[in-house]
Amino acid sequence: MAAEEPEVDVEGDLAAAPGEAASEGHENTASSLLQDHYLDSSWRTDNSLPWTLDSSISEENRAVIEKMLLEEEYYLSNKSLSEKIWLSQKEAEKRSVKSPHKKTGKVMVRSPTKPGSYSLKWTSEEKELFEQGLVKYGRRWTKIAKLIGSRTVLQVKSYARQYFKNKAKNDGSEREEQSQHGGTLPTEDGVRVEAWSAGNLRGRADPNLNAVKIEKLSDDEEVDITDDMDELFSPAFQQGVGKSELSIISESPAEETKGTEHPFPHVGHSSAVSLLKEDPQNTKQPTVDALLFQDGAATCSQHVNGDKSVNLEYQQCNDFIEKAEQGRTGMSHGARQITDQELNEEQRDLADNGLLFHPPCQVDEDHQEEAEALKPPDQEVEIDRSIILEEEKQAIPEFFEGRQAKTPERYLKIRNYILDQWERCKPKYLNKTSVRPGLKNCGDVNCIGRIHTYLELIGAINFGCEQAVYNRPQPADKTRSKEGKDTVEAYQLAQRLQSMRTRRRRVRDPWGNWCDAKDLEGQTFEHLSAEELARRREEEKLKPSKSSKGSRQIKSSFDPFQLIPCCLFTEEKQEPFQVKVSSEALLIMDLHSHVSMAEVIGLLGGRYSEADKVVEVCAAEPCNSLSTGLQCEMDPVSQTQASETLAARGYSVIGWYHSHPAFDPNPSIRDIDTQAKYQSYFSRGGAMFIGMIVSPYNRNNPLPYSQITCLVISDEISSDGSYRLPYKFEIQQMLEEPQWELIFEKTRWIIEKYRFCHSSVPMDKIFHRDSDLTCLQKLLECMRKTLGKVTNCFIAEEFLTQIENLFVSMYKSEKKSNAEENKNEHSSELES
């Protein structure tokens, strides 16, 4: 019978607009369908009142709902559908990706966001792998998805939700079947199945045969985890059933008022219809069991196609249930009558399974997850230092997953070191910070902290200390309540340790750095320029340290602007590659850094030779900076333009540079973090990425030459665990003449950009109190030193003279324009 009916696209993605359907001559549009077609007399509000859709519904959802109603009228009145609808269905059939299961008559639901390129049905092998992964990894869907291989994380997560719900429902149905008498009808999950006679469903068999199981699940897919639909839609089953005896609960608010088949409205945002398996020997009266699932704390509201909500008051929900009971009194003799006492029992069963409506506040209280406190250990635990227990592998799984950086040997080293430190300081409390200095190159501080927490929770360390905390609340997984006590406790430990991975809410401080929100509470900030900051640090170094007897103020443990001296490469740790820099790049970096007391920034272009292990820096491209005086970041637009300029010259981006105008060319903690991120990003393609820091006016440097540091960031962690160690390269200058015209044009651009800035350096002022050179003369000395290695002195002097004249002329024109402006202002004041 199902094969004779036209295939209906229930997704509605390509549904025709209601206006278009009407224009084709269809008289009964969805907005004017009478309730007589659908509702029993006890449900009608008015015999002649037409249905109207809520005006707040969007046009897209309105079209989908109206199309569904038009299709229902076709089934009920045997009227032909409009030509527009048939055309849209044919177009949808051409565009849609057909499921291979459609050949057997089973209707599958495709994702509304993307066509299904995979089998929506879970195979038995996938289900077995899912259950194995659940036992092995718990609720870690990423790992379970990797174990299965053929499913994504979202698919596994969606399947797991239905798996746990069905498992809970099946447990409840087994208890119900044991307590029920043999004379009652079959039940499942505490909901009695009503037998409907053929008379009540006359003319409604066709739409039921074409019914589709629709679930609104998380993220992007619908997962069918029951095998019941296969048997129901098989040809043999359909022949045995005939036309009459299927009933389903409507799946959406638009279908909810179509008949009296459902005694209860569905709850929450998702509901599932599972069809009860039919006994092959008894096909006279098949039944359908409706399972209504709740997601969290349900409220009496439902979403129409996920767009607008139809709110129902609690009293209206009860009235709806009462009307449904009244509507069932008109059943034929084939239906079983339900007495008031049985109805109360049914409501109690529904309430036990969380399927009956409650007031919103009551439902919220009932569904709140309770945090279970872990019991403190009764005695101190002694751990064998040479072995790793299975409980440890379950609690700290990251060291036993085959990672290159986190191995079981490293876990043993960290664990045994923490145990040794506890033996030394016992009975004094052993905190996490005190064990970090002895665990260099053993991973990040977070994984060390998790091992410390695990040992503390089981009583291996800090036993009997007041500071030890055992009641770390974490929702317990109720699906593991039937497992052994030891397994459950180990799983709870793993859950608590995994909860430590969640990051705290972080905000930006006044300098733009990410930090914990609590770190900013009660603080005041003083805004200093880079020069003032360097001067203040010098003064603090010169001040004698005073030992105060009273309580001294605790200094902040993290300063993003703290300068970190670079380590030198040794024979044990050799340079990964050599760095050669062209004279052009050195000249541009010097020019750029000398004209501003704020930090400047730019990109380095060149090439990397894998065979020779050499990085050649051939060009430097200045960029606009987003500077606050204390730090600078590269402007994204300017960065893109600089990358394109380097690519046009045939160079790759192999590094970046920035200036420390008046302090040492050592990277700050923030610079280290930025450089490490760049290195990680570029290393994916096998490229190298270096950082260079130029310090033109360092007060600790009496020489007129700029200080330049070329560095990379290693994987080694500092003693306090707050940063990775930077390493410094020895720079070799390439013996090639620069492109004179290009440098001259870059110089003109730099002067034009910075001469009007507030941070502009007065090039005619003395650069250092112990020197007679002006800032411009100092710049020329730096350039003279660079050019002395690549060209003869005559060419170099001629070029430097041109650079000097360019600076003088442009800065003089600036002074002249300023003088004219001041003169005009004075004259206007006198005239007024």
Swiss-Prot record:
Keywords: Activator, Chromatin regulator, DNA-binding, Hydrolase, Metal-binding, Metalloprotease, Nucleus, Protease, Transcription, Transcription regulation, Ubl conjugation pathway, Zinc
Domain (SANT): residue spans on this chain: 117-168
Domain MPN intervals: 579-711
Origin superkingdom: Eukaryota
Keyword Chloroplast annotated: no
Residue ranges occupied by any SWIRM domain in the UniProt entry: 374-472
Domains as described in the record: Binds double-stranded DNA via the SANT domain. The SWIRM domain does not bind double-stranded DNA.
Family to which the UniProt record says this protein belongs: Belongs to the peptidase M67A family. MYSM1 subfamily.
Protein name per UniProt: Histone H2A deubiquitinase MYSM1
Gene name tied to this protein: MYSM1
